[in-house]
């Protein structure tokens, strides 16, 4: 939490802080051997290991899609549809959402989409702050609804059934969440279309704009939507993610190679002892997040095994008389976690999950409903916080772009408080659902 508030969303430091926290915790424990044994149990937690393996596969899958120029294909489509200004801003939201829906990676979407959509959007007359908000919102849409996203996986697998073994099924949770997502999704498109245009004049000439747009187009990139559609369809129908994702990788590789979008060397190559390509790059991009997940899960397991969570649930649930009160408590508690821990939206999801599960079971809430409260709350206001990981990543990409292109405007971190429409609207939709 402290690192988030000082804009130090560095994964290595967060991992180090977690390890230091575990060491400090040992000082307050009577049986230190048992303490570390419990930590090892937490590190090997089945939920954590399931997420780790899926994330590694997702890392490879998402990198292959980027190598296949999916982004360039989407930009080509927007140009052919004559999208500019507000229309392009709405399209940026849709394209970002499509990419995030395919990969399930919010940060990966921001990192992949910003270098392409942001400069082109500025050229076409988009309001820079609103355009950035559209990219983040699209990323959050995919992270919230994609069957392969870490948010969907963690929020579902952490909510257990009361009367039988197992956790909330991912496919069922996604289907149940759609009725909340659709109103927020449509409202966001309308708002980005209304507020996406800029009143200022463009600072570049038409020739430069035409050259820049032309250099980031490839209609063949749209072919990479084929594996995307297959993965989403299989996952929603209930197929195991360990089956759907490898199928997506195989299809994406085949499509990319046949269409000439990339070669075998783009997937894996060794030059002068240096390994490169989509396969090692995809795994490397997920390693730190996976390690951080394991550390945080082990810390959460300590809270549960110590009896602290049971005592906290007992105190919080004493005055709960009706189901709606439990739903409000779960939703607001998860929201508070998302704001306090904004560096990575998966972390508040993991931290709040045990308490949400305990309170929800006591109030006899279905695991699907609990998972949706958790996923929506943890993918809400943290997206637009000035110290949040999404905003910091977006600004980092924009600043890198602006160093070589004077026409690219760099918004202030606080500008996104009012432009990340989708996650905020979705939070309101869920809040209203609790009321009704």
Model feature map: region roles:
Residues 1, 9-29, 51-58, 90, ...:
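Hydrophobic mid-bilayer segments of alpha-helices in multi-pass membrane transport proteins
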Residues 11-19, 27, 35-72, 270-310, ...:
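Core transmembrane alpha-helical segments of multi-pass membrane transporters/permeases
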Residues 45-51, 76-94, 122-131, 217-223, ...:
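Membrane-interfacial loop-to-helix junctions in multi-pass transporters
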Residues 4-16, 41-45, 79-84, 175-176, ...:
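Interfacial loop-to-helix junctions that mark the boundaries of transmembrane helices
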Residues 30-33, 44-48, 125-129, 154-174, ...:
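Juxtamembrane helix-boundary/capping and inter-helix hinge elements in multi-pass membrane proteins
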Residues 137-139, 144-213, 383-436:
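Juxtamembrane and boundary regions of transmembrane helices in multi-pass small-molecule transporters
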Residues 86-99, 125-142, 325-338, 365-384, ...:
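Alpha-helical transmembrane segments of multi-pass membrane proteins
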Residues 52-61, 83-116, 316-357, 362-363, ...:
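Hydrophobic alpha-helical transmembrane segments of multi-pass integral membrane proteins
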């Amino acid at each position: 939490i402290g690192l988030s508030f000082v804009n130090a969303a560095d994964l290595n430091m967060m991992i180090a802080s977690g390890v230091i926290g575990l060491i400090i915790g040992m000082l307050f424990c009577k049986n230190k051997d048992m303490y570390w044994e419990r930590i090892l149990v937490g590190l090997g937690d089945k939920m954590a290991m399931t997420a780790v393996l899926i994330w590694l596969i997702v890392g490879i899958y998402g990198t292959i899609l980027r190598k296949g120029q999916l982004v360039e294909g989407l930009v080509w489509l927007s140009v052919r549809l004559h999208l500019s200004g507000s229309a392009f801003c709405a399209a940026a939201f849709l394209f970002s959402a499509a990419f995030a829906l395919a990969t399930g990676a919010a940060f990966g979407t921001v990192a992949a989409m910003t270098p392409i959509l942001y400069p082109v959007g500025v050229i076409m007359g988009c309001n820079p702050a609103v355009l950035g908000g559209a990219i983040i919102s699209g990323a959050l849409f995919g992270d919230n609804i994609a069957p392969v996203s870490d948010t969907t996986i963690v929020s579902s697998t952490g909510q257990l059934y009361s009367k039988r073994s197992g956790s909330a099924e991912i496919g069922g949770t996604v289907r149940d969440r759609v009725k909340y997502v659709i109103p927020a999704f449509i409202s966001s498109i309308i708002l980005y279309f209304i507020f996406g245009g800029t009143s200022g004049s463009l600072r570049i000439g038409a020739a430069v704009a035409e050259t820049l747009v032309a250099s980031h187009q490839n209609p063949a990139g749209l072919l990479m939507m084929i594996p995307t559609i297959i993965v989403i369809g299989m996952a929603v129908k209930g197929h195991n993610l360990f089956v759907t994702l490898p199928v997506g990788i195989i299809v994406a590789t085949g499509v990319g190679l046949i269409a000439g979008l990339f070669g075998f060397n783009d997937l894996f190559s060794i030059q002068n002892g240096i390994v490169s390509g989509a396969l090692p790059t995809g795994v490397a991009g997920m390693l730190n997040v996976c390690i951080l997940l394991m550390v945080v899960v082990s810390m959460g397991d300590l809270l549960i095994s110590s009896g602290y969570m049971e005592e906290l649930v007992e105190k919080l649930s004493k005055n709960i008389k009706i189901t709606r009160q439990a739903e409000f408590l779960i939703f607001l508690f998860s929201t508070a976690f998302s704001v306090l821990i904004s560096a990575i939206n998966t972390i508040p999801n993991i931290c709040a999950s045990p308490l949400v599960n305990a309170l929800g079971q006591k109030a006899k809430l279905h695991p699907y409903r609990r998972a949706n409260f958790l996923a929506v709350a943890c993918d809400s206001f943290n997206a637009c916080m000035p110290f949040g990981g999404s905003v910091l990543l977006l600004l980092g990409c924009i600043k890198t772009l602006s160093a070589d292109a004077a026409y690219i405007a760099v918004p202030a971190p606080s500008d996104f408080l009012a432009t990340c429409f989708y996650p905020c609207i979705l939070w309101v939709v869920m809040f209203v659902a609790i009321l009704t």
